[in-house]
Design a protein with these regions (language model features):
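Alpha-helix N-cap/helix-start motif at helix boundaries, enriched for small hydrophobics
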Residues: 37-39
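Short helix-to-coil transition segments within interhelical loops
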Residues: 29-35
Length: 165
């Protein structure tokens, strides 16, 4: 599930690598479209690929439940896996796009690895923080609240990075 959401998000980022080979990076500067519209299209493409990954992950979960029953310990496990996948993807996109425009296309792969590791680290850090804030046997409501906090932080970083880029 995580691989579907994160993997499909990587598709939109990987497509930026091909810009220099196709000379699009030079051509887009001469078009009558504003730079902000081009940047917003990258963010929108990223979100669309994330949604495609979520759909594939949802289909995978549904098929798994239909064929094997419910393989998770708690009802919230699927929710948390989706929150982690979406959170890592949004953090990754929120970090990658500003780095890409600051550093240029030459270091695209390096920025991709950095943003992926930062996304994973931020989700793990938030999870650790939430585990220390809530008492040890977490209730279902606390788990859902923790997931909502992770999602809200990831979405905030992603939304803030769009105008910054």
């Amino acid at each position: 599930m995580l691989l579907a959401m994160i993997g499909f998000s990587l598709i939109s980022i990987a497509s930026l690598r091909k810009e220099s080979a196709t000379k699009w990076s030079k051509y887009k500067l001469t078009t009558p479209v504003k730079r902000s519209a081009i940047v917003q299209s990258y963010f929108l493409s990223f979100l669309l690929w994330l949604i495609v990954g979520m759909v594939f992950a949802g289909i995978g979960v549904a098929l798994s439940i239909m064929l094997h029953g419910f393989p998770f310990d708690k009802d919230t496990d699927v929710f948390l896996l989706f929150v982690m996948g979406i959170g890592i993807s949004l953090f990754m996109g929120g970090i990658f796009f500003p780095l890409f425009y600051i550093g240029g296309e030459e270091r695209n792969e390096v920025f991709l690895v950095i943003s992926l590791l930062c996304g994973i680290g931020l989700v793990m850090g938030l999870t650790t923080l939430l585990n220390t804030l809530f008492p040890a046997p977490m209730t279902t409501m606390q788990i859902i609240l923790g997931g909502a906090i992770i999602f809200a932080c990831a979405l905030l970083i992603f939304v803030i990075s769009c105008p910054v880029t």
